Amino acid sequence: MGRRILFITTDQQRYDTLGVNGGQLSRTPVLDKLAAQGIRYERCQPTSVVCMPSRSSMLTGQFPSTHGAWMNGVPLAIDAPSVAENLHDAGYATALIGKAHFEPFMDPFGLYAENALANLGIPTIEQDWFDGRRGVHRGFDYLEFATHGVMGPLHYAKYMNEHHADAITGFYQVVDHSLNVNAAGGGDTGAPQVKFNPVPREWYHTDWVADRTIRWLEEQRDDRDWFCWMSFPDPHHPWDPPKSEIARVPWREVPLPVNYPESASEREALLDAKARHWREWYDGRVVSNYEAPAKWVPSTLTSDQVREVNALNAVEVELIDEAIGRVLKSIEAKGWGDDVDVIFTSDHGELQGDFGLLFKGPYHVDGLMRLPLIWRPALSTKPEPSVVRAPVSLVSLAATFLDVAGKPAPSWAEGAVLPSSDDEAKARSFDATFTEWDSSFFGIDVHVRTVVTEDYLYTEYLPGTMHDGSEGELYVLGDDPLQRVNRFDDPALASVRATLAEQLAGHEHRPGERATPGILMAPV
């Protein structure tokens, strides 16, 4: 037998939101304890800074340019590789409860399994697998889905409609009647995607995901290993946690982020030093992606709005930490407390006021790219607590799950098993990670490639409608941890830039088969 695996993800959570990572707003004792017992990674990077490509990389162990789900709204091919299929073959019971997002949410005809299962009333469905066989959907025996608020025909929305229909209007409407991301403001400050939600905490999707996970775990046998992916939709916008909880973090007492320049002129100068789409989005001249409200202009963001958004975000993080604690207690009650590997991370980050911006997009800086990652191996293995400072990637998760299960990584996995110490990371050449962005929206094409090492963050903009291929960004992380001074054109770093460019080229031209890029089927 291998070991049982609890894989926990959140959506759009920054590295610095956890207490163990220096966060000051949220109390996260459960996750902090897991980090103290296991391995904490100081520089974990996503393969993409948006949901669908990043989540598809966690499942497949491949970069977006390999698995083909290159943008939100582009479904991961139904026969794409899936680590859950390998675990299922190894005898594991497999479940995904919460947010999946391998397929578009905007699917009025129910073309995709993620949007059909709740109405069908079945736990999974048979589909084609990567190796030509047919089996349970993406390798999961059991699926229950949720997303932000009550969007889509998912299990959480069905639960709310059937049991608490009167509470549905309390949630923020993520998409407006024009099918654009809603720009309406709320709360005390009029911040976009904010609403005071009267829903009782026990009906909110964070507790629902934990409750459904606990129920599934209680049904598992002692003589069978399991892999459970528990996936919380928060702290992704909209920021509409239960109103009963918002007093935990009074927004008026929240300090402004260290990377929020209060002066408009300072913000503009910082943005002008980056590639031009930064400033043009800030001014409202372009909408380069669907990841933020199209009708919202970032330059209108006020300091109080930043405070309120960060306060509500912190509340959501606290609720997640408490929900994780409940699930871990249920595991202990089953007698499995020492025999479960727990891995926690998020799919990408959130700007949260950095550079005067909110949300996400083709902006490859730490706010979006530096993620929390904690691996607490089963206590029965007597793990040595450690901190890994070398760069690692979410693309390594699939191989890591299989290693825990006692199985080798398949040939299609592009990521190697996560190192358990800095010495191991160095010995195994964990020296660089890669992040990709491709988008085509509103007639604007943006293509970004980034390599991150221990010392540098280097970005190239490939030719598109916004860039001619000559632009880029280069930050010296030791001197400039906030990525404010772009040294892409600094002659003193010419040799460094050449080395990093060579690493990026190696990533772009790496060997191996790649899926045909998927077709954009929906905005998200």
For the regions a language model picked out, list residue spans one by one.
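Short, charged, surface-exposed hinge/linker loops at domain edges
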Residues: 513-524
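Formylglycine-dependent sulfatase
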Residues: 1-461, 467-470, 482-502, 521-523
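A short N-terminal helical cap/helix-turn-helix that marks the beginning
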Residues: 508-509
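Residues forming the ATP-binding cleft of Hanks-type serine/threonine protein kinase domains
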Residues: 478
